[in-house]
């Protein structure tokens, strides 16, 4: 069995990877600093960040497969990252209220044994339902929107805010499992392997 290393401290990514391959992976959060690169398209920027995270974690291992991801919400040409205080979460939710937006993830899988690195992006369209100001504030008060791209959690209480999703639901949570499975297959790793059960 190949050693799998998740380059993320995100509880959501850990849980999604666990659904795919069980508990057979290590968690090694990256300390990569995301430099501002305003000239890049958002998809390219997220891929660059995922590459940076994977390569940062690779410094600590000589063997294994490193998985890293970077997710943001795109609305009207603006990249909405993770709000770190309630007022910012409220502002983001008011922008997305009753509108369609896109969740984009840059995904990198780095095979240290073969020196292969595969990076791709995944996009998911999301339609948020309309909420009044009190509903937005009530959701913000739960604390759930903090530290979530776009200030919502599709897998938590935020699920009731989502009217419709087109594309990979798991991408909207932070790790596109379909694309990840296909990349692992390219590297000779099957999620159906008995060692992952």
Swiss-Prot record:
Active-site residue numbers: 70 (proton acceptor)
Cofactors named for this entry: a divalent metal cation
GO cellular component: cytoplasm
Alphabetized CDD domains for the sequence: Maf
Keywords (A to Z) from UniProt: Cytoplasm, Hydrolase, Nucleotide metabolism
Residues spanning the membrane: none
Family indicated by similarity: Belongs to the Maf family. YhdE subfamily.
Protein name: dTTP/UTP pyrophosphatase
Origin species: Methanosarcina mazei (strain ATCC BAA-159 / DSM 3647 / Goe1 / Go1 / JCM 11833 / OCM 88) (Methanosarcina frisia)
Lineage of producing organism: Archaea, Methanobacteriati, Methanobacteriota, Stenosarchaea group, Methanomicrobia
